[in-house]
């Protein structure tokens, strides 16, 4: 038995076929793989990505910290809640890992979110925490939250039907 996302019981109730993915019990399919593939390519589909590491970053040096840590420029995140794909660099400019940074929203103007791969969790967090020591920032891992990726050409409409604003 592996690690479980907050949505694990829902996957079981929906009769998902579960597999080990990096130590996590994750759904690989519910019905036909081909039908699910076509649904996402032609319409929409949802994926539990809660096994990925969700970090919240706050503090007066949050932007400076991210600028030091990443190859990409977080100043490019001009709209609230927008995401930026980047790589995290070591002290010599080599790539440690890739990740996604989300800009703060009007509701939480000082809160940045960073999504890190689950397979490199320990290494990435150790590096991020070591770098944070030189900045006035706080890194908080949020294992209590679920993350769902909604993908496909009709994904925006589906999300808008559930969430009323700023999507």
What is each of the regions a protein language model found here?
Residues 1-167:
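Basic, glycine/lysine-rich polyanion-binding surfaces/domains
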